[in-house]
Amino acid sequence: MKLALRVAYDGTAFYGFQRQPGVRTVEGELIRALTKLRIIENPEENDFKGASRTDRGVSAFFNVVSFVPGERADLAKPEVLNHHLRDVWVLGVAEVPDEFHPRFWARGKTYRYYLVDEGFDLETMLECAKLFEGTHDFSAFAKLEPGRDPVRTISSIVMTQRGGYYVVEISGESFLWEMVRRIVNALRFCGLGLLEVGEVKSMLEGIYTKKIPPAPAEGLVLWHIDYPGIEFTGDGRGIKKARRDLFERYSRALTRAALFGDALLEL
């Protein structure tokens, strides 16, 4: 038997998803809780795998890990695990085939970036967004790793205005390192008049002298991963702690935003 967990986390509390010596990571926090509860003995023996290795500061509402459970498989449920985790919440569990791999079985991902409105020209940003849709070489909009194919397919980019900020939702089959954050910054630069739409088109055609830098990691969240035929289930008890923790973070952030907003008005 193999289990998969749907997990959410506050990326600002970690040095990224992947385990690293001497720093706190999402993967490390999950493995700590799973081994403490004797759900697994160690990540290698129990075939622990993750779907997306998000960078430091990047959050997730839907990431997935899988493992072969040990003697206490009965404890691998949200209502138990969430009492042993900090800044990470298990939102669902699914029994999956033995050959399941959370990275390679994913059929698509959706990211959301939360972008404060700086007086953008929305029409220009939407024109720029359309250029990214489809299949392109994204070398100019990624931090390339040796041997990785820079060609990717973006199925859609949707921008939604909510009060004083925009939600930029980007969906595709797979993404390169920092690709979403660099696309968002390209949209931002176009919206501010710092970059021409024609320049973005040229960059996608391989004509450029410098790359677009990534937008800050804190605005990005891995929103959804598509696994056809797999359903993650959890009950109200398991979600209760996640909801309470998220509301506390929301309340603190809103208080700080109000404080700094009033300070700006006085300057």
Q: Residue ranges of each PLM-predicted region?
A:
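Structured-RNA-binding interfaces characteristic of tRNA pseudouridine synthases
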Residues: M1-L267
